């Protein structure tokens, strides 16, 4: 008889966003005339930039000709895309990378999960709380943890509370850990880390022979010129950090799917025999075995993001979303809501009014305002009493949602 992976049974409930979807569908069925505005899951709403769309069309046309037809591409990604990323995303930051250190994928969510393939099971993992659920759940799924306690913490994971007192930036763990998840600009709190704050983590990782998984999916939304866009802006980070980036929010690729992982050759691990070994070599081996590469049209579209015209158009969309964030942030502050984020990130993290639980506030907004957000407790126990709103909606919907909330909370 085929046996299941029992680790999946440790997961306490359904993935956060499907549970939100279930509740919204139930409400919509019971209230068919209600106009529900969704400011929950971080899905984009603006169309692809014209330059990106043209590259997409041209690439599809290539597939209709014998001369330009593209079949299997390099598993690591086409050099013309990798070089564009190096030249336009990293060189301006003063970061030098080799083409062999960048891997094109079909999205950073998969990468954040798949990277665990090349790390031993007995590594000690440190995760922020609240946190993007994928970091936590994928470690549970592969069997790195025990059962969850009454708070929802899994045995075998070191949780680093992120709260108002520490500015939602985790403090260095007191115990030695081997893998550290960091996400800045942060999802869900919308906060950012300074170079000095990141330097503490890089120094810790190098001193403890640990590896940082740095999720930079929202770096394009940074407005403060003093805030680093990449972990590699920090001295010593190329020895200890793997960086994940995504085209999903930056360029509206949530339905297109493209991301990248940077694995510097200097990031080393230790074999069971105590030998040093490059994670870059392991990730290349894993990639060539389990992945056939992102599609040719998608990579052509991604490369167009880095053209002068493509980036100008992409930046206009980013600015559109950040104006949405300002509208949400300022509107909530007008009625006395305590808010965080929304300045260098497209997420607004708010304190639930009156000490309500996160899910009670979710139900209140849904039933009384017909507005959908994301309960903070869905991101971890330290998210209880908080709530996330996304700036990725249509402008008119964002304005209407904010007015509904303001009227309800006055």
Curated annotation (Swiss-Prot):
Its EC number is 2.6.1.83. Substrate binds at residues 15, 42, 109, 132, 187, 292, 388. The modification N6-(pyridoxal phosphate)lysine is found at residue 249. Its cofactor is pyridoxal 5'-phosphate. One of its GO terms (molecular function) is L,L-diaminopimelate aminotransferase activity. It catalyses: (2S,6S)-2,6-diaminopimelate + 2-oxoglutarate = (S)-2,3,4,5-tetrahydrodipicolinate + L-glutamate + H2O + H(+). Pathway: Amino-acid biosynthesis; L-lysine biosynthesis via DAP pathway; LL-2,6-diaminopimelate from (S)-tetrahydrodipicolinate (aminotransferase route): step 1/1. The keyword Manganese does not apply. Pyridoxal 5'-phosphate binds at residues 72, 108-109, 132, 187, 218, 246-248, 257, 292. GO terms for biological process: lysine biosynthetic process via diaminopimelate. It comes from the Bacteria. Keywords: Aminotransferase, Pyridoxal phosphate, Transferase. Belongs to the class-I pyridoxal-phosphate-dependent aminotransferase family. LL-diaminopimelate aminotransferase subfamily. PANTHER family: AMINOTRANSFERASE. Homodimer. Involved in the synthesis of meso-diaminopimelate (m-DAP or DL-DAP), required for both lysine and peptidoglycan biosynthesis. Catalyzes the direct conversion of tetrahydrodipicolinate to LL-diaminopimelate. HAMAP family: DapL_aminotrans_1 (MF_01642). This is LL-diaminopimelate aminotransferase. The lineage of its organism: Bacteria, Pseudomonadati, Thermodesulfobacteriota, Desulfuromonadia, Geobacterales. The gene is dapL.
């Amino acid at each position: 008889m085929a046996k299941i992976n029992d680790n999946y049974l440790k997961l306490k409930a359904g993935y956060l966003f499907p549970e939100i979807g279930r509740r919204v569908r139930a409400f919509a069925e019971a209230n068919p005339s209600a106009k529900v505005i969704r400011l929950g899951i971080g899905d984009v709403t603006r169309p692809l930039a014209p330059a990106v769309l043209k590259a997409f069309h041209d690439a599809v046309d290539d597939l209709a000709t014998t001369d330009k037809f593209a079949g299997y591409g390099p598993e690591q990604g086409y050099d013309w895309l990798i070089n564009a990323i190096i030249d336009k995303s990293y060189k301006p930051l003063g970061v030098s990378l080799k083409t062999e250190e960048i891997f094109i994928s079909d999205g950073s969510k998969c990468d954040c999960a798949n990277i665990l393939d090349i790390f031993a099971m007995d590594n000690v993992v440190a995760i922020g709380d609240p946190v993007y659920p994928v970091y936590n759940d994928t470690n549970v799924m592969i069997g790195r943890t025990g059962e969850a306690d009454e708070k929802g913490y899994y045995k075998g994971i070191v949780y680093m509370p992120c709260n108002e007192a520490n500015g939602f930036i985790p403090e260095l763990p007191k115990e030695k850990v081997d893998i550290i998840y960091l996400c800045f600009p942060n999802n869900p709190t919308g906060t950012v880390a300074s170079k000095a704050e990141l330097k503490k983590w890089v120094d810790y990782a190098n001193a403890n022979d640990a590896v940082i998984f740095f999720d930079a999916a929202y770096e394009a939304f940074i407005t403060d010129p003093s805030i680093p866009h990449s972990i590699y802006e920090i001295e010593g980070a190329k020895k200890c950090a793997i960086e994940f980036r995504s085209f999903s929010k930056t360029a509206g690729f949530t339905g297109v799917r493209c991301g990248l992982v940077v694995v510097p050759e200097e990031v080393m691990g230790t074999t069971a025999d105590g030998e040093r070994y490059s994670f870059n070599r392991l990730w290349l081996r894993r990639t060539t075995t389990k992945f056939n590469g992102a599609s040719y049209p998608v990579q052509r579209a991604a490369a167009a993001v880095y053209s002068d015209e493509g980036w100008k158009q992409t930046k206009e969309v980013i600015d559109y979303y950040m104006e949405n964030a300002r509208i949400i942030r300022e509107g909530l502050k007008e009625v006395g809501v305590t808010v965080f984020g929304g300045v260098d990130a497209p997420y607004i993290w708010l304190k639930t009014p009156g000490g309500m639980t996160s899910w009670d506030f979710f139900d209140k907004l849904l039933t009384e305002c017909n507005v959908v957000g994301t309960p903070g407790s869905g991101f971890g126990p330290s998210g209880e009493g908080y709530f996330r709103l996304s700036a990725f909606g249509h402008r008119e919907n964002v304005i209407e949602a904010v007015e509904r909330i303001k009227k309800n909370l006055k």
